[in-house]
Amino acid sequence: MAKVIQLSDELSNKIAAGEVVERPASVVKELVENAIDANSTVIEIDIEEAGLSSIRVLDNGEGMETDDCKRAFRRHATSKIKDENDLFRVRTLGFRGEALPSIASVSHLEIKTSIGEGAGTHLILQGGNIISEQKSSSRKGTEIIVTNLFFNTPARLKYMKTVHTELGNITDVVNRIALAHPEVSIRLRHQGKNLLQTNGNGDVRHVLAAIYGTAVAKKMIPLHISSLDFEVKGYIALPEITRASRNYMSSVINGRYIKNFPLVKAVHEGYHTLLPIGRHPITFIEITMDPILVDVNVHPSKLEVRLSKETELHELIRDGIKEVFQKQRLIPSAQLPKKSAPAPAKNEQQFMTFEESAPERKLPEKTPEPSYSPMKLSSVVKEPEPVIIEEEILPNEADHGVPPELGMPETAAPVSDTPEPEAVSEEIREERVPMMYPIGQMHGTYILAQNENGLYIIDQHAAQERIKYEYFREKVGQVEPEVQDMIVPLTFHYAANEALIIDQHQHELESVGVFLEAFGTNSYIVRCHPAWFPKGEEAELIEEIIQQVLDAKQIDIKKLREEAAIMMSCKGSIKANRHLRNDEIKALLDDLRRTTDPFTCPHGRPIIIHHSTYEMEKMFKRVM
């Protein structure tokens, strides 16, 4: 008796459904992507009980003729590719011909479709089998209703999460598709309640506002960079806007939402030292590339892709984000969010505006500078507007600011393919931090300073940490550092297994200034160290660098140097409760203005907080 048998189409579809239709969100994703491939401009999605009861997707796309509609429910039947060559130049969201038969095999499915000429087609399927065929209206487009999902696969139904969790997954999928296709009007409703409505005007900022709220959308700045093989556009949130999850970072390649950890890593590297540990930015990155450079035929869900020239793309995104932030003034406002009643839900997102009305600003009259200030204003700082502004924008730097309605052109100018050796000149660096006049200290920890724009509070430890970090980062990278001999050498003792690791990574340790000599069994002696090591903390610093090597699963010299620079800057910086003289404060602020990233310490904490004059007057009821 033969042991190898041919599985039936019904069983094959159920097996395929295990990968394609993982949960209700998978059904929504496949149906909406099919609607987009059909050139729909309006898509309506109605969900009942998080999709477990009913999923309805209605579009105004091209529709299908009767024969095509029947054929679409056969395995690997598709209109999107015709031969093997098409597989390597996929420009549509779907192409495998698995989604519809897989969905139909584990549900009750009803479809009405028409090409707009004559009567349409109305099919009813159960478990993948057509049980009814009728004529339908001639309205151009397609309507698909999926009910009783997983009715014949109880094991899959048993592992469904709560209604709240499944609805969250559906919302997440639709949000990302809406971001990838702002030219399509998408409405998502759950049990009659609107969860998302986009207007399909092609402006991704309006979609960002619909998903994250207008306040967050106004804090997102445009990104536009390109190279020979890639064009990258999108919006990235200012570093003050963070989340605890990476789920707010969206990547799209050729109109397809994807999950790709190297791209997420590239974005994080672009934000390097600007985000607190454990926090993540809100970003939307849209990549356009030749389809031959991306393989989307990796997994039936089509979320995972393989990229050619991934390293080049990684560097392009990382450097592009860094360059955008190097032209920004990133001083957050100290104002607290105001509690207010939630706004009534709107059925449409039409006519959304980013504008904030404000009186015309004029340059303030030049006032005499205090005699004690050694710093000069490199540019006149404008008077603040009497509106809620959480981030100051550089004058004449609108290209890298907020959406156009807030005073910037439609798109930011693309970043040059060839980065300059020094991205930010000394003049631009000093302009990014406004001129501030010290007026005192608070608790020996915070410096208070002022100018015509209001009050600035500076964390003195974080400020010096940033200054020293940039100094040590340069020093640690030196090939032959200036070495200083120690009068009393330092000795270190380790367990046998640790000594083996240390011996293996002597070269890496020397690259960060730790010069070890064998000194007996599992012991080492240090007779010299780079001259720039923080005085009095050499032993502790060397121990911590060695510990990093012992703890690391894989040694990355670049990362090791980075961690060493951060460690030295933290240890050598001013501590809390240290009262500074006026000249020390002024020197500290002067040095801070010359740093590359003067707004956060190496750990991502803010250095400067701003209280605008207007907000101060408002708090004291001098203005209403």
From Swiss-Prot:
One GO biological process term: mismatch repair
Biased composition (Basic and acidic residues): 358-368
Domain of life: Bacteria
Disordered: annotated segments: 355-377
Entry keyword set: DNA damage, DNA repair
Keyword check for DNA repair: yes
GO MF assignments: ATP binding; ATP hydrolysis activity; ATP-dependent DNA damage sensor activity; mismatched DNA binding
Name of the protein described by the UniProt record: DNA mismatch repair protein MutL
Species, as recorded: Bacillus velezensis (strain DSM 23117 / BGSC 10A6 / LMG 26770 / FZB42) (Bacillus amyloliquefaciens subsp. plantarum)
